[in-house]
């Protein structure tokens, strides 16, 4: 992390780089996110992905989710209070062992760059107030067949987080599970 920050500073000294040398947890997530206008979720566990989604919801912070596994990557953008949320689509984390870990299943390394670049484009579009964001749709990239598809979804009125009667009313640490897709 330190070397990446140094490289960013060397490339563009006008950029402010802030490091958070601690794990994201329910008790520190809101404080970590509070100063940012847009969050890009590059985490790799279900526990972290759900925590980022929940924290962004409670903080009212727009964010881009991404996940990769094997030869496939996915991304979507969430605008809390204005679009469907991560839990509208995925509900709860899968039980431990239900999804293979990244080391078990493997990950095509270039997927992180491809999906991360799409996330960066989403952030720029949001910050500039232009273009069509990936809200209420999941963009899926299949590297084996070099194809993209979109999966549309709507806000779930019964969503645990943003529904009419949410059961999640505070941040919580999820049970860690394998690598997240």
Language model segments and positions:
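Adenine nucleotide-associated cytosolic modules
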Residues: 1-181
């Amino acid at each position: 992390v330190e070397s990446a920050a140094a490289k960013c500073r060397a490339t563009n000294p006008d950029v402010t780089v802030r490091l958070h040398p601690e794990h994201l947890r329910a008790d520190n997530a809101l404080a970590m996110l509070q100063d940012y206008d847009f969050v890009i979720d590059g985490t790799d566990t279900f526990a972290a992905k759900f925590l980022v989604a929940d924290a962004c919801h409670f903080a009212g912070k727009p964010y881009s989710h991404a996940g990769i596994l094997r030869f496939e990557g996915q991304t979507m953008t969430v605008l809390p209070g204005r679009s469907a949320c991560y839990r509208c689509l995925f509900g709860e984390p899968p039980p431990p062992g239900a999804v293979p870990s990244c080391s078990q299943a493997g990950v095509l390394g270039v997927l992180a760059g491809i999906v991360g670049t799409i996330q960066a484009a989403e952030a720029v579009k949001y910050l500039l107030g232009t273009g069509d964001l990936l809200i209420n749709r999941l963009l899926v990239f299949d590297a084996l067949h070099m194809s993209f598809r979109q999966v549309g979804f709507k806000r779930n009125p019964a969503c645990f987080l943003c529904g009419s009667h949410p059961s999640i009313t505070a941040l919580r640490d999820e049970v860690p599970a394998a690598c997240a897709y």
